[in-house]
Amino acid sequence: MLRDPRAYLWDAREAADAILGFVAGVDLDSYASTPLLHSAVERKFEIIGEALGQLSKVDPSLAQRIPDMRDIIAFRNVLIHGYAGIQHRRVWDIAQSSLPGLRTIVAELLEGLGG
């Protein structure tokens, strides 16, 4: 049974909030040299990609309102299947540049659905 679209948006928002909290006040060198930190960030990105991938199955029209949806899901797949080649700088850059905007959009969609 498929979940309510709000549940997927909630999962994505919560994972984004966690990442933003994890990297607050941390520089790239500290991030890259702290396995616990980059493991946690990568896991939360996996959750975002999976949640939004499931959202695209449950409510494709809602999912289309999220820019770069394909890239988000593809990034999740890289983290899951290409784990040996993950570049900390790439993950860091996405967390710093793309994630805040994604978090805003997901929160707005969730709010619009009464969540």
Model-identified regions with their sequence ranges:
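Solvent-exposed interaction patches of small proteins and small membrane subunits
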Residues: 1-115
